């Protein structure tokens, strides 16, 4: 191994002068070794584990991958930058804090605190060294106490809140340092009656009023009377009063679980009180979950042809991809935050259901076509739901209307298997509007009772006089729809809610929508929302055109619309406020209709269209002023003008749109032409730019930052517009570089808080990349593909590596360090990465409100008719949409005889013992077929055993001395192992008799043929990647440097062909002689279609995106053997002594490998342990097997720092140490990672190189290419002192321990059992093979060949061309030869076929 710090540092120092070093260079080498480890020893280039014949070579033995690399290209070394950045950058400090919602503080203690300052979401404070400018720029954090749920019921609270928000923030407030509100667990008692939480809230409010008498000057008597009154009502009534802002608590008559039927079913609860009918639904955010995905067709913008894409609906963005396995490179995106509607398209043939649908946004309409009408409806519903959510802030829906406003209730059967009725309600006394609310009950009895109850309430309500016209009051306008309106839809928002002191009898909910979520980085939107009315006269026609297009959509689509920028009139701009610095910088802002808001003292006017005429409706407001009267007079004048010009509005809107946009474009070209030229020249010149804080930077480094704040904000807005990112995504740095895929593509790299993005800049290219930082495992520097360029490799979880090239080394190094810093910061962010602090507060407030309502329901009186709830949230779940679900029981009705066939070392057998123990618990009869020396170990666990020929030690010696499957390996194996392979095949055939299911390690070579002869399902299970993928290279062909997805994929194809050609002759002879099968080849066997079970953790080797469905990474199959094992006294005393001395303990063991010079290896271990100043538990294991007999003894005296053991269970031993160093076998690597300790791997052969790279990529260990004192001592010191590595290893260990690999594997077997059976029968029918010569009891001999033909039609494979040819030839052969099945004669274990 190269000295990974000193070499990198020397190279960096040669590139950077002492007078000027970049930020990345100053922070790159923050951690350093002790002085004793900085100097290389004489053996720095030696490798004491290499065979003697290869010590003279530069890199030791020649493996197969090295010969492949010499044919492709030789690339340079890379520098390990992981865990070398102790100091965080300024940009990192801004985003390291994360909201914490869990607290150890009891809930009642937090509620009783002051709701004005004490109840809040805790956000860890930034370091005290943060600059004052950053404090001034920090976004104000609103506490939960400002949410309406926690406000004291005092007059003027809203105005006080406004004053408080207007005052400057001198520093961290008291609320920023207090504990958050924890999530309450459900009580575990048998009774549903929980503790009276609401009563504690009453006490809290009483305590608040006594502590703050100036805010509520009430007498003590009044307070006591208020508390006594509140104590007389139920907690549910008080909670509903707070949620819906009733003036007094109203007795809850009845409660029902039902759904509000709009464009989608909103599951929630209906509460019938003495005066109101209320509905509440909780809609939690699920921003990181893919809502819906699948193949649909999309029509081009100019090309009417429909092209098939893979679509993914996630968060607020609908993305489509040409390749579903390449989800980081979208072909396009549709930002649904600016969506208007989603609806089915009317089919031309009325007799057929439509498969076409469309999505309308504020700038164009997208047309789609699904495979079926059902799929189209599902997509429309999902899109409508997202649009509905994006148009309404908050996470809960509240609807409330007075009972006296109800006109009638009538049944309306709309949903099958459900009771649905319609409630018609008068909106208010000021209008003639009548609203219709549809409620669906999936319990018919509850629906009938609710219907009868509401009918009875209406009959007992005095008749109302029809509402008449009234003058326009001073109130905030709300849009109206055909069914329901915005002022009846209240989605709880975390921003300030305006508390209404005077109530009218309205059908709307009293909870008013707060102001929209602001964007601190968007001066354009702030200016739009705070401008005045006077420059909106030119643009009103444009808004009317938009409204006209909206109202022309279908009714179901219009019901989900609630956006203020669409339905309310344009707000007012003054030309003086419009400056060049706040000009619209992208299409979204130029096309977006300005929003209206009430937080700046202006009331918007909404337009409502009823038939062919336009009319204005208004809602409540609290203040009157001269400014408001002037505003309404201007509105009245505008009404007269609009009434006469409405027929021409759409044409005028189009003309005004073109005119305004033409002016803006001409002004842009006139004023920005020189800037455009400068940008283009700067683009080709390359470079980099940072967007963090500039305090404390050197003058030379300030040149990397934008000159003005406006420029920085404009760049961030453009970045978000390019990639359809949320307003909270903050750009950190940008670089110009080449992205290498098929060809180098020039473009721009963007690094933000949570994502790494790339956008091509070449004309005619539209490549975009959006890569979440949590999917990045590592970043490494490489040499560039082009001369004079510098490479950067991004290692992605479950995906092939990405290659970037920079024209300057400084830019490449800066990008690498910035990415490492962002990766470190991203680990501490919450999973919902797209939520701002305000949105997070709103989410938590909604959760608290929902939780308190659930507590109040449980505390409700038993006399109330409480029905079981539908669900905790209003999310609609599809049936059986998760492949991991357990709705259907796949377990066979009868127990199976299962044989596990494997060869190799102890680590190859141990996972199958664990799997067989799980199968035993399921009632099956497992058997392990392997080498005879493992029989006592297998039978000790109660598992049947069958012997297989072969000596694992001899095979291991061959692998170590020649490398895995190199030319020398194949040459010696051909000369010495031909007889061994024949014996292996024959013994495996005997061992697998009388089996119903076969699970085999593919290294055994015989299983797929045996399953074909026995006509039984066949699975493969292995400890290393064996299936074709672009994400990882074949475990036996790991290159020294990253070579990309194409190389990775070809290693599997090449290995399959080389491996098969080496054994094909012997296997085909064995098939014909013993199995009675015809000769075969790779096309007929289709090994890449076999169900595969990988027994390693998906946290260690994430499933690649291009794995097929039948390939599953189940998790480690661990075998716990420490329960009945007692450690020797000497070992226990050694561990205790090391802990008392304060020394780190490491485990060093190279089991299952063979070395030619055990003495030199032992000496290297001793000197490395002493130099690193650690304590060592040494396990020799198989290190000297087949070597000199004297090597079984200790060659040199071991110092007291080292304690040698013969063997110990890994699960016990690794829990006692601080780091582990071993050969990197799959089982040992899994055990050390499961224990959560840093792992040092010195690979010798096979998959050990693969797992060594994985450990390095995950940042949980070190992979050593060579083993000597210099390298090993540094690795031991790093593994025991690097905090980043230690923390990562602990986190990975927790994830692995939470997995149950055996249970997952058994469920996967059950699910794919039928598929595996069909696949085996297909291969058998091709070989013209009837049932096995020794058929199992589950198979009947009288089954004819017609079953085989039917089986062939059950499965359709999509893959390579050669794979597609096989099913076709199979069907042709089966049809033509169904009546010509050869007869069979059984002689012992050999089947002789007569020619047909």
UniProtKB/Swiss-Prot annotation:
Residues 238-273, 717-783 form the GRAM domain. Its main location: cytoplasm. One of its GO terms (biological process) is lipid glycosylation. It catalyses: a sterol + UDP-alpha-D-glucose = a sterol 3-beta-D-glucoside + UDP + H(+); ergosterol + UDP-alpha-D-glucose = ergosteryl 3-beta-D-glucoside + UDP + H(+). Its EC number is 2.4.1.-, 2.4.1.173. SMART domains: GRAM, PH. It is an enzyme of class 2 (transferase). It is found in: Cytoplasm; Preautophagosomal structure membrane. It comes from the Eukaryota. Residues 1-21, 40-64, 83-196, 209-232, 460-532, 571-627, 1324-1346 are annotated as: Disordered. Keywords: Autophagy, Cytoplasm, Glycosyltransferase, Lipid biosynthesis, Lipid metabolism, Membrane, Protein transport, Repeat, Steroid biosynthesis, Steroid metabolism, Sterol biosynthesis, Sterol metabolism, Transferase, Transport. It is a peripheral membrane protein. The keyword Iron does not apply. GO terms for cellular component: phagophore assembly site membrane. Residues 484-532, 571-584 have a biased composition (Polar residues). PROSITE patterns: PH_DOMAIN (PS50003). The GRAM and PH domains are required for the localization of ATG26 to the preautophagosomal structure (PAS) and are involved in autophagy. Belongs to the glycosyltransferase 28 family. Sterol glycosyltransferase responsible for the glycosylation of ergosterol to form ergosterol-glucoside. This is Sterol 3-beta-glucosyltransferase. The gene is atg26.
């Amino acid at each position: 191994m190269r000295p990974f710090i000193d070499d990198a540092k020397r190279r960096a120092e040669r590139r950077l002068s002492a007078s000027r070093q970049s930020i990345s260079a100053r922070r790159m080498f923050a951690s350093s070794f002790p002085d004793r480890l900085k100097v290389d020893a004489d053996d720095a280039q030696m490798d004491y584990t290499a065979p003697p014949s290869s010590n003279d070579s530069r890199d030791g033995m020649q493996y197969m991958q090295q010969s492949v690399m010499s044919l492709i290209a030789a690339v340079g070394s890379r520098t390990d930058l992981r865990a070398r950045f102790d100091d965080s950058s300024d940009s990192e400090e801004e985003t390291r804090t994360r909201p914490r919602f869990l607290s150890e503080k009891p809930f009642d203690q937090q509620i009783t605190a002051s709701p004005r300052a004490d109840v809040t979401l805790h956000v860890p404070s930034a370091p005290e060294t943060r600059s004052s400018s950053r404090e001034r720029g920090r976004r104000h954090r609103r506490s939960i106490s400002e949410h309406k749920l926690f406000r004291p019921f005092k007059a003027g609270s809203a105005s006080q809140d406004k004053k408080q928000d207007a005052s400057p923030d001198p520093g961290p407030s008291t609320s920023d340092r207090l504990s958050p509100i924890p999530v309450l667990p459900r009580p575990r008692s048998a009774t549903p009656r929980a503790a009276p939480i609401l009563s504690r809230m009453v006490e809290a409010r009483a305590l608040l009023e006594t502590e703050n008498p100036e805010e509520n000057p009430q007498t003590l008597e009044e307070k006591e009377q208020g508390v006594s009154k509140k104590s007389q009502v139920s907690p549910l009534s008080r909670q509903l009063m707070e949620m819906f802002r009733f003036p007094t608590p109203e007795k809850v008559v009845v409660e029902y679980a039902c759904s509000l039927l709009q464009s989608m079913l909103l599951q929630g609860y209906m509460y019938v009180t003495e005066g109101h009918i209320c509905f509440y639904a909780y809609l939690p955010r699920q921003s990181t979950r893919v809502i819906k995905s699948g193949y649909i067709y999309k029509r081009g913008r100019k090309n009417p042809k429909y092209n098939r894409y893979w679509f993914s609906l996630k968060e607020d963005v609908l993305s489509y991809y040409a390749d579903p396995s390449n989800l980081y490179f979208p072909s396009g995106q549709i930002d649904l935050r600016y969506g208007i509607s989603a609806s089915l398209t009317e089919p031309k043939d009325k007799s057929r259901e439509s498969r076409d649908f469309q999505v309308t946004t504020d700038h164009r309409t997208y047309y789609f076509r699904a495979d079926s009408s059902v799929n189209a409806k599902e997509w429309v519903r999902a899109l409508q739901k997202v649009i509905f959510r994006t148009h309404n802030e908050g996470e809960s829906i509240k609807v409330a209307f007075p009972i006296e406003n109800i006109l009638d209730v009538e049944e309306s059967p709309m949903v099958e298997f459900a009771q649905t009725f319609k409630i018609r309600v008068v909106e208010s006394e000021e209008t003639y509007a009548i609203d219709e609310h549809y409620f669906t009950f999936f319990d018919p009895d509850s629906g009938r009772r609710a219907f009868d109850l509401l009918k009875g309430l209406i009959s007992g309500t005095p008749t109302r006089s029809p509402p008449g016209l009234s003058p326009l009051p001073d109130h905030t306008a709300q849009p109206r729809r055909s069914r329901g309106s915005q002022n009846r839809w209240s989605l709880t928002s975390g921003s300030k809610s305006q508390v209404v002191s005077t109530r009218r009898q309205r059908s709307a909910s009293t909870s008013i929508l707060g102001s929209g979520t602001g964007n601190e980085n968007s001066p354009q939107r702030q200016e739009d929302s705070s401008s005045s009315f006077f420059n909106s006269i030119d643009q009103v026609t444009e808004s009317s055109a938009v409204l006209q297009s909206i109202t022309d959509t279908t009714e179901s689509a219009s019901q989900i619309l609630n956006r203020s920028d669409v339905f309310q009139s344009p707000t007012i701009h003054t030309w003086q406020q419009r400056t060049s610095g706040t000009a619209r910088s992208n299409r979204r802002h130029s096309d977006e209709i300005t929003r209206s808001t009430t937080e700046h003292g202006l009331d918007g006017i909404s337009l409502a269209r009823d038939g062919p005429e336009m009319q204005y409706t208004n809602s409540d407001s609290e203040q009157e002023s001269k400014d408001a009267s002037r505003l309404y007079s201007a509105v009245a004048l505008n009404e007269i003008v609009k009434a006469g010009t409405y027929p021409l509005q759409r044409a005028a809107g189009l003309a005004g749109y073109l005119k305004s946009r033409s002016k803006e474009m001409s002004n842009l070209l006139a004023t920005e032409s020189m800037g455009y030229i400068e940008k283009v020249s700067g683009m080709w010149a390359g470079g980099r730019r940072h967007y963090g804080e500039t305090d404390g930077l050197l003058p030379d480094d300030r040149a990397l930052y934008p000159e003005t704040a406006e420029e920085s904000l404009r760049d961030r807005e453009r970045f978000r517009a390019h990639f359809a990112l949320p307003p909270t995504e903050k750009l950190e740095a940008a670089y110009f570089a080449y992205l290498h895929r098929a060809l180098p593509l020039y473009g721009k790299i963007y690094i933000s808080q949570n994502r790494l993005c790339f956008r091509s800049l070449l004309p005619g290219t539209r490549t975009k990349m959006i890569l979440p930082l949590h999917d990045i495992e590592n970043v490494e520097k490489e040499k560039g593909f082009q001369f004079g360029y510098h490479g950067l490799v991004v290692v992605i979880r479950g995906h092939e590596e990405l290659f970037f090239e920079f024209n300057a080394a400084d830019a490449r190094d800066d990008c690498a360090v910035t990415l490492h810093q962002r990766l470190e910061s991203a680990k501490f962010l919450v999973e919902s990465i797209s939520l701002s602090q305000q949105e997070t507060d709103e989410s938590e407030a909604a959760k608290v409100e929902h939780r308190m309502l659930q507590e109040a329901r449980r505390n409700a009186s038993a006399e109330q008719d409480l029905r079981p709830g539908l669900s905790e949230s209003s999310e609609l779940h599809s049936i059986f949409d998760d492949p991991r679900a357990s709705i259907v029981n796949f377990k066979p009705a009868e127990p199976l005889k299962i044989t596990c066939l494997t060869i190799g070392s102890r680590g190859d057998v141990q996972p199958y013992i664990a799997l067989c123990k799980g199968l035993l618990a399921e009632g099956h009869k497992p058997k392990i077929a392997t080498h005879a020396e493992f029989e006592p170990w297998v039978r000790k666990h109660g598992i049947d055993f069958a012997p297989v020929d072969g000596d694992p030690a001899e095979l291991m010696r061959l692998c170590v001395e020649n490398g895995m499957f190199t030319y020398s390996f194949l040459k010696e194996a051909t000369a010495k192992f031909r007889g061994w392979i024949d014996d292996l095949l024959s013994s495996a055939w005997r061992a697998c008799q009388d089996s119903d299911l076969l699970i085999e390690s593919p290294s055994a070579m015989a299983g797929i043929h045996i399953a074909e002869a026995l006509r039984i399902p066949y699975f493969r299970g292995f400890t290393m990647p064996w299936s074709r993928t672009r994400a990882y290279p074949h475990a036996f062909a790991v290159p020294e440097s990253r070579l990309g997805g194409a190389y990775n994929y070809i290693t599997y194809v090449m290995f399959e062909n080389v491996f098969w050609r080496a054994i094909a002759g012997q296997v085909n002879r064995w098939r014909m002689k013993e199995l009675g099968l015809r000769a075969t080849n790779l096309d007929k066997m289709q090994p890449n279609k076999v169900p595969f079970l990988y027994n390693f953790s998906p946290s260690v080797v994430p499933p690649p995106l291009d794995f097929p469905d039948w390939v599953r990474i189940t998790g480690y199959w661990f075998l716990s053997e420490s329960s009945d094992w007692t450690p020797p006294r000497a070992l226990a005393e050694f561990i205790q002594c090391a802990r008392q001395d304060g020394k780190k303990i490491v485990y060093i063991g190279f089991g299952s490998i063979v070395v030619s010079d055990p003495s030199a290896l032992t000496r290297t271990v001793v000197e490395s342990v002493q130099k690193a100043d650690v304590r060592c538990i040494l396990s020799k294991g198989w290190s000297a097997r087949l070597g000199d007999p004297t090597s079984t003894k200790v060659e040199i005296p071991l110092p007291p720092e080292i304690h040698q053991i013969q063997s110990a269970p890994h699960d016990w031993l690794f829990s006692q140490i601080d780091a582990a160093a071993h050969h990197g076998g799959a089982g040992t690597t899994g055990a050390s990672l499961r224990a959560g300790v840093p792992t040092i791997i010195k690979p010798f052969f096979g998959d050990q190189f693969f797992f060594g790279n994985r450990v390095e990529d995950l940042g949980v260990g070190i992979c050593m290419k060579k083993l000597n004192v210099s390298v090993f001592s540094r690795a031991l010191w790093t593994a025991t002192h690097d905090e980043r590595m230690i923390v990562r290893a602990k986190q990975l260990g927790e994830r692995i321990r939470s997995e149950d690999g055996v249970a997952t594997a058994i469920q996967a077997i059950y699910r794919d059992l039928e598929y595996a059976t069909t696949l085996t029968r297909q291969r058998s029918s091709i070989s013209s093979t009837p049932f096995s010569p020794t058929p199992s009891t589950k198979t009947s001999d009288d089954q004819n060949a017609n079953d085989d033909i039917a089986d062939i039609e059950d499965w359709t494979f999509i893959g390579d061309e050669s794979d597609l040819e096989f099913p076709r030839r199979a069907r042709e052969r089966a049809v033509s030869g169904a009546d010509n099945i050869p007869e069979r004669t059984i002689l012992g274990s050999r089947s002789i076929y007569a020619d047909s």
